[in-house]
Design a protein with these regions (language model features):
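Short, charged/polar surface micro-motifs in flexible loops or helix N-caps
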Residues: 84, 96, 125-127, 204, ...
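Short edge-strand/loop segments of extracellular domains
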Residues: 96, 135-142, 229-234
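Non-heme Fe(II)-dependent double-stranded beta-helix
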Residues: 1-13, 19-111
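A short beta-loop-beta micro-motif enriched in histidine and acidic residues
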Residues: 103-115, 192-193, 199, 220-221
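Double-stranded beta-helix
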Residues: 129-212
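Non-heme Fe(II)/2-oxoglutarate
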Residues: 40, 204-206, 210-290
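A short secondary-structure junction signal
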Residues: 100-105, 128-134, 143-147, 217-218, ...
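Short, conserved beta-strand element in jelly-roll/cupin
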Residues: 110-127, 198-199, 228-232
């Protein structure tokens, strides 16, 4: 559970770090499952280290990880922040390569479709060795909108990853009235004012997906997995957005995953008899997002 001040911290700044929420024994077991899932996806081939390797549905693929999703230490804070009828959105296990430029995971602040990412790093990460950097308060208007030019750097990256096009970047440059290659806000991407959320194995980061975040200087193959939750969609616009995110997930699987599946969600997870998991996937089943 979050204290009232911890909840206020999250709502105001857009993130909170729960230090050593998971024990060393738990982290050892989780790390073993992480390696097993990603090795299985690569069919036991070595990680080439050329591009990011991401496995969608990561937390759904092993009993230990599914148990973590409904663990009080994860579930109860999410319930406090999103409400008792919150839904499951997705998860992924990642081996990262290079920097991750400034971006937000959600670009729809006006729809009030609140989403939270829970991130767990399996290795120590610092300011200049790949930890998550965040811009506090950037999940709230008007600050969120004022930072929109920052997406330029990330849009260049996703072109290289095969997830966007130069035409889309050109359109963004035109909309923002910026010049390609110029210093946004007068600084390099890595010098944008921010807070580095340095992390040790066992720490867990909760952050609003509208929050601007990045990572710089990390080693090739740094390991991190996420669990993503959302408020229960109550408007047609929110449901449409949920469906759109489902389609984007399918596109990302084709680019970053080795063993491609048409299914976004694991069968055992989607049709679990566990009350908490049943509750958070009920909307997905209702909408046919399997």
């Amino acid at each position: 559970m979050l204290t009232s001040q911890e909840k206020a911290h999250f709502e105001t700044f857009g993130f909170i770090v729960r230090r050593q929420l998971l024990s060393s024994e738990e982290m050892a077991a989780i790390t073993g499952e992480f390696e097993d899932v990603l090795n299985e996806d690569r069919q036991n081939k070595a990680f080439a280290g050329e591009t990011r390797h991401a496995v969608s549905g990561f937390a759904e693929k092993r009993l230990l990880l599914r148990q973590l999703v409904e663990d009080d230490r994860i579930y109860l804070p999410i319930e406090q922040l999103l409400g008792p009828d919150f839904i499951w959105q997705s998860s992924d296990g990642n081996l990262y390569v290079g920097d991750t430029a400034w971006h937000r995971d959600a670009a729809d602040l006006e729809l009030n479709f609140k989403r939270i990412k829970v991130a767990v790093y399996l290795d120590p990460v610092g300011r200049d060795t790949g930890c998550l950097r965040v811009i506090p308060g950037s999940h709230r208007a008007p600050f969120h909108d004022e930072l929109r030019p920052l997406n330029y750097w990330r849009k260049k990256q996703v072109i290289l990853e095969g997830r966007s096009t130069q035409a889309e970047l050109d359109q963004f440059i035109k909309e923002m009235n910026i010049t390609e290659g110029e210093l946004l806000f007068g600084v390099e991407s890595s010098d944008v004012p921010c807070v580095p959320l340095e992390s040790q194995p066992g720490d867990v980061v909760f952050f609003n997906q509208h929050l601007y975040h990045s990572s710089f200087g990390g080693a090739t193959g740094r390991r991190m997995f996420t669990m993503n939750f959302a408020v229960n969609p109550t408007t047609d616009e929110q449901v449409t957005l949920l469906r759109k995110n489902y389609e984007i997930g399918a596109k990302n699987r084709r680019v970053m995953q080795h063993t491609i599946s048409d299914r976004k969600y694991d069968e055992a997870f989607l049709h679990s008899d566990r009350p908490r998991i049943k509750g958070m996937v009920a909307k997905l089943v209702e909408l046919g997002l399997e």
